[in-house]
């Protein structure tokens, strides 16, 4: 589970409320008709605060299990990890062939980054590139084509369960969206925004976006649903559009660590052998602290009339 915190929390700490995310923040600001990436100064501070908070959470867990390994979420768990870890000792000294293999791998990664930027590759092309790179690395390592195939299949086995969990979580969100269930949920949640003042309404916007994000984990998808609805309400109540966008960003980003419909998170939890109920029981208090701080910050920004440009 510590590996999950280091990798997934590390990723989300910068991405969830990132100040230069074109696919989420850029889209939301464009739809709200405010300058793209305006308000960067405040968002940089918020992003750094989020990184610091999740780093502290990770370190608290690390120190707890270092002092007492039985307090690990994995201890005594009957929910098995997707990966089998061997306890056999191996020779840590790298051979010349292994060094060559590592060099080819690093060169391949650098080449992939360059080609992705130059040729504007999408995810499918990148996946195809790495599939071909796997064959090259296998040959450099001295394996036959049959051995490469066997090792590839063996490597895919632990990912099947995680992929199934990821697909299932995403499918639920698709069903809610295609079934028009989300339209009703969003409408009901938006009603109280018209009944309160600007400062309280700004904080309430964060809460509404948190709830909506449980059903729409996609940031761009939530922006398409919420921004056209929130913008006229913000104008009516007296909330600045910059604050409305920030409320959306807080609600969308911070809730990604909370919703079971977040396919990538559920897949990562499956890989480390932690069930969602066990995870949320541990993480809930920290996530509520983070969301609570976001509500207060949003209300303060509205109180000072933040427009960001």
Which residue stretches match the model-derived regions?
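Hydrophobic transmembrane alpha-helices that form the pore/transport pathway of multi-pass ion
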Residues: 1-32, 215-249, 272
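Alpha-helical transmembrane segments of multi-pass membrane proteins
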Residues: 1-13, 39-43, 48, 198-213, ...
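Alpha-helical transmembrane segments of multipass membrane proteins
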Residues: 13-14, 46-54, 108-112, 209, ...
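Transmembrane alpha-helical segments and their short flanking loops
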Residues: 18-45, 81, 235-243, 263-309
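Long, contiguous bundles of hydrophobic transmembrane helices that form the permeation core
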Residues: 40-151, 271, 306-309
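Hydrophobic, small-residue-rich membrane helices and short re-entrant helix-turn-helix hairpins
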Residues: 141-160, 276-282
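Loop-to-transmembrane-helix entry motif
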Residues: 155-159, 163, 192-196, 247, ...
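Hydrophobic alpha-helical transmembrane segments of multi-pass integral membrane proteins
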Residues: 166-169, 176, 192-232, 236-237, ...
């Amino acid at each position: 589970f510590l590996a999950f915190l280091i990798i997934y929390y590390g990723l989300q700490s910068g991405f969830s409320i990132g100040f230069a995310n074109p696919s989420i923040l850029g889209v939301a600001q464009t739809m709200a008709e405010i300058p793209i990436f305006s308000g960067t100064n405040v968002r940089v501070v918020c992003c750094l605060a989020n990184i610091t908070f999740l780093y502290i959470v990770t370190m608290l867990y690390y120190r707890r299990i270092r002092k007492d390994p039985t307090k690990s979420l994995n201890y005594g768990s009957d929910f098995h990890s997707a990966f089998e870890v061997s306890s056999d000792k191996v020779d840590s000294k790298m051979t010349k062939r292994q060094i060559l293999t590592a060099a080819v791998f690093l060169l391949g990664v650098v080449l992939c980054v360059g080609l992705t930027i130059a040729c504007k590759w999408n995810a499918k092309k990148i996946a195809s590139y790495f599939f071909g790179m796997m064959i090259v690395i296998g040959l450099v390592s001295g394996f036959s084509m049959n051995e490469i195939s066997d090792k590839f299949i063996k490597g895919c086995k632990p990912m099947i369960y995680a992929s199934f969990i990821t697909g299932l979580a995403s499918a639920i969100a698709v069903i809610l969206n295609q079934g028009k269930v989300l339209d009703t949920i969003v409408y009901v949640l938006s009603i109280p925004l018209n009944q309160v003042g600007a400062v309280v309404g700004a904080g309430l916007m964060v809460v509404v976006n948190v709830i909506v994000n449980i059903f729409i984990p996609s940031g761009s998808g939530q922006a398409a649903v919420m921004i056209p609805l929130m913008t006229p309400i913000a104008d009516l109540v007296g909330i600045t559009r910059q604050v409305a966008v920030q409320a959306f960003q807080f609600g969308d980003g911070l809730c990604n660590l909370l919703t079971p419909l977040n396919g990538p998170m559920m897949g990562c939890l499956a890989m480390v052998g932690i069930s969602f109920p066990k995870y949320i029981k541990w993480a809930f208090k920290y996530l509520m602290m983070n969301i609570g701080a976001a509500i207060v910050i949003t209300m303060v920004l509205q109180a000072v009339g933040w427009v960001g440009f």
